[in-house]
C-alpha cells in the first residue's frame, strides 16, 4: 500500500506489498523488496536498498547507497524469518549497511531514535542501538553489540561481538573494543582502555555538578581503588538507591557478560 502523498521516482523499484507512508520520498534508483514498511516523512535520497522484514519509522533521512535489512553475514543463517527495525528521526549516511537479525540472537537488528550513522558504518546482525547515538565514519559493530543512549563511537573503531557499551560513553577514533564499557566512561586504544569520565558530554546533557562528582567517584572506585568489580559493586548498589544516575551502573553490570575494559 502506497499513501497518495508519497513521492516515488520513476526509476525506483517498489515491490508489491510494501507499505509506504504519508509524505515519504523515495528517490532515483532505490529498491524496496520484501515486507518493508516505511513510515511518514522518511526520505530515501537515491540508490538506497531496503529488503526483508524491515520497518523504518518516521522522519528518517537515508542517503545514497545505504543498504538496510539485507541478509546478514552470519554463516549459520539459512534464510530464517528475522527483522530489522529502525525508529524515528535518524540520519543514515552514504554506504551504511544494517543487516537483519538471526534466530541464534534476538531475531531483530534494531536502531532507536535520533541517531546519526556516518559514512560507511556497519551494523551487524542482532545489534541493538538505542537513542541519540553517533557512529562516526567507518565504525563497525559486530553481531549482537548493544549501544545504550548517547554513545559516541569514533571513526574507524571496531566493537567485538556481544559487547555492551553503556550510556554516555565516548569511544575515541580507531578504538578496538573487546570488552564491555561502563556508562559515562571515555575510552580509546587497541585494545580500548578507560581514561576518564565523559564530563563534557554530561555537561551538555544537563547533568548537575553533584551528580558528576558522584560519577567520578564511581569511576575511581572501579579503576583506581585497586579492587575487583565484585568488591566495589555492593558500594555502587548502595549509592544507586538514592541516586538514579548511578542506577545506570547497576543495570549495566547485571547485563555485562564479557567483563569490563581495564
Swiss-Prot record:
Q: Which InterPro entries match?
A: Acetyltransf_C, Acetyltransf_C_sf, Hexapep, Hexapep_transf_CS, Lipid_A_LpxA, Trimer_LpxA-like_sf
Q: Please name the pathway.
A: Glycolipid biosynthesis; lipid IV(A) biosynthesis; lipid IV(A) from (3R)-3-hydroxytetradecanoyl-[acyl-carrier-protein] and UDP-N-acetyl-alpha-D-glucosamine: step 1/6
Does this UniProt record's set of keywords contain Nuclease?
Answer: no
Q: Give its E.C. classification number.
A: 2.3.1.129
A GO term, aspect molecular function: acyl-[acyl-carrier-protein]-UDP-N-acetylglucosamine O-acyltransferase activity
Is this entry keyworded Lipid biosynthesis? Answer: yes
What keywords is this UniProt entry annotated with? Acyltransferase, Cytoplasm, Lipid A biosynthesis, Lipid biosynthesis, Lipid metabolism, Repeat, Transferase
Major localization class: cytoplasm
Which GO biological process entries does UniProt record here? lipid A biosynthetic process
Q: Where in the cell is it found?
A: Cytoplasm
Q: Which reaction does it catalyse?
A: a (3R)-hydroxyacyl-[ACP] + UDP-N-acetyl-alpha-D-glucosamine = a UDP-3-O-[(3R)-3-hydroxyacyl]-N-acetyl-alpha-D-glucosamine + holo-[ACP]
**What's in the GO CC field?**
cytoplasm; membrane
Give the family this protein belongs to, as stated in its UniProt record. Answer: Belongs to the transferase hexapeptide repeat family. LpxA subfamily.
Q: What does this protein do?
A: Involved in the biosynthesis of lipid A, a phosphorylated glycolipid that anchors the lipopolysaccharide to the outer membrane of the cell.
Q: How does it assemble?
A: Homotrimer.
Q: What is this protein called?
A: Acyl-[acyl-carrier-protein]--UDP-N-acetylglucosamine O-acyltransferase
The gene behind this protein is lpxA
Amino acid at each position: 500500500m502506497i499513501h497518495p502523498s508519497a513521492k516515488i521516482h520513476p526509476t525506483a523499484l517498489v515491490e508489491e506489498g510494501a507499505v509506504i507512508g504519508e509524505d515519504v520520498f523515495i528517490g532515483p534508483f532505490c529498491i524496496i523488496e520484501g515486507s518493508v514498511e516505511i513510515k511518514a516523512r522518511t526520505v530515501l535520497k537515491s540508490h538506497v536498498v531496503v529488503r526483508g522484514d524491515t520497518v523504518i519509522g518516521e522522519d528518517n533521512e537515508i542517503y545514497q547507497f545505504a543498504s538496510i535489512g539485507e541478509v546478514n553475514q552470519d554463516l549459520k543463517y539459512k534464510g530464517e524469518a528475522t527483522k530489522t527495525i529502525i525508529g524515528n528521526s535518524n540520519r543514515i549516511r552514504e554506504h551504511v549497511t544494517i543487516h537483519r537479525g538471526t534466530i541464534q540472537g534476538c531475531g531483530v537488528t534494531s536502531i532507536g531514535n535520533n541517531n546519526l550513522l556516518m559514512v560507511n558504518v556497519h551494523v551487524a546482525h542482532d545489534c541493538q542501538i538505542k537513542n541519540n547515538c553517533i557512529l562516526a565514519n567507518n565504525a563497525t559493530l559486530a553481531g549482537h553489540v548493544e549501544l545504550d543512549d548517547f554513545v559516541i563511537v569514533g571513526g574507524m573503531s571496531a566493537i567485538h561481538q556481544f559487547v555492551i557499551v553503556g550510556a554516555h560513553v565516548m569511544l575515541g577514533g580507531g578504538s578496538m573494543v573487546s570488552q564491555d564499557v561502563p556508562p559515562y566512561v571515555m575510552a580509546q586504544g587497541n585494545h580500548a582502555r578507560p581514561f576518564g569520565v565523559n564530563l563534557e558530554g554530561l555537561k551538555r546533557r544537563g547533568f548537575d555538578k553533584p551528580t558528576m562528582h558522584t560519577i567520578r567517584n564511581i569511576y575511581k572506585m572501579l579503576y583506581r581503588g585497586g579492587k575487583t568489580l565484585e568488591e566495589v559493586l555492593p558500594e555502587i548498589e548502595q549509592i544507586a538507591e538514592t541516586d538514579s544516575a548511578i542506577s545506570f551502573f547497576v543495570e549495566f553490570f547485571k547485563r555485562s557478560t564479557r567483563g569490563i575494559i581495564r
